[in-house]
């Protein structure tokens, strides 16, 4: 199964590369024609064509992120430092958004086994969704706590907005406790989206990163706020010595 999975993603990567090459040619041609013949910019069809090309390119970029979310190169990661680096990375990725960040996190150095690049892509998806829900100006809360068992840590991202349009009161999928919910599976299905003109890969990326990290994922709405939480196994001392 793993071999077939790797082969599938390899073929997808090749096909995506070829499609992106063709799209780059189309966009370059569109830009050249627009420059040589500025009078055609007033034609509605021409403007719609440019929007369509950009829209398809955006979809391909999103599928690229989804494809790479399957990769996993584990290493010891200081989760506390990682969380506090998120606002700066978010501001670089989304300079037009003015969200404030509030932290309520465990100040101890907590280590997990993770691929920092893939984990960052998952959290950027959650932060971006939280920002969009509050018109890119509201406050985003990042919370972390070590669970009662002492072996796991949960990180949650909360933003204003609800999931009322898909009407889940609460849902979760957590391999750590062997739980599942059909609605979570539906939301995490590639290209399923409640937004217009949306690629529908955000939660798919998050769910896949959680799966490769043996982490749990939960999502719920209460009192006009939506919270997404990820639960990680804490790296034990013996594991730290054996992790590169």
Question: Residues of each region from the PLM?
Answer:
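Conserved DHp (HisKA) dimerization/phosphotransfer helix of two-component histidine kinases, i.e.
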Residues: 25-29, 42-98
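Short beta-strand/loop element within the Bergerat-fold HATPase_c
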Residues: 137-151
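Conserved HAMP-HisKA connector
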Residues: 1-19, 27
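Short conserved segment of the HATPase_c
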Residues: 164-190
């Amino acid at each position: 199964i793993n071999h077939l999975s790797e082969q599938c993603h390899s073929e997808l990567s090749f096909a995506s590369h070829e499609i992106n090459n063709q799209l780059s040619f189309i966009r370059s041609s569109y830009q050249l024609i627009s420059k040589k013949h500025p009078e055609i910019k007033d034609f509605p069809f021409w403007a719609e064509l440019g929007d369509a090309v950009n829209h398809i390119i955006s979809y391909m970029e999103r599928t690229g992120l989804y494809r790479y979310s399957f990769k996993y190169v584990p290493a010891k990661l200081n989760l506390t430092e990682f969380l506090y680096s998120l606002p700066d990375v978010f501001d670089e990725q989304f300079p037009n958004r003015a969200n404030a960040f509030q932290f309520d996190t465990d100040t101890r150095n907590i280590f997990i086994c993770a691929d920092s690049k893939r984990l960052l892509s998952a959290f950027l998806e959650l932060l971006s969704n939280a920002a969009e829900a509050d018109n890119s100006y509201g406050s985003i809360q990042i919370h972390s706590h070590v669970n009662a068992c002492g072996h796991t840590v949960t990180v949650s991202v909360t933003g204003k907005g609800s999931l009322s349009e898909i009407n889940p009161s609460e849902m979760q999928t957590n391999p750590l406790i062997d739980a599942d919910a059909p609605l979570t599976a539906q939301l995490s299905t590639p290209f399923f989206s409640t937004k217009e003109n949306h690629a529908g890969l955000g939660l798919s990326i998050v769910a896949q990163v959680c799966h490769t990290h043996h982490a749990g994922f939960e999502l719920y709405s209460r009192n006009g706020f939506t919270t997404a939480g990820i639960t990680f196994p804490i790296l034990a001392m013996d594991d730290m010595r054996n992790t590169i």
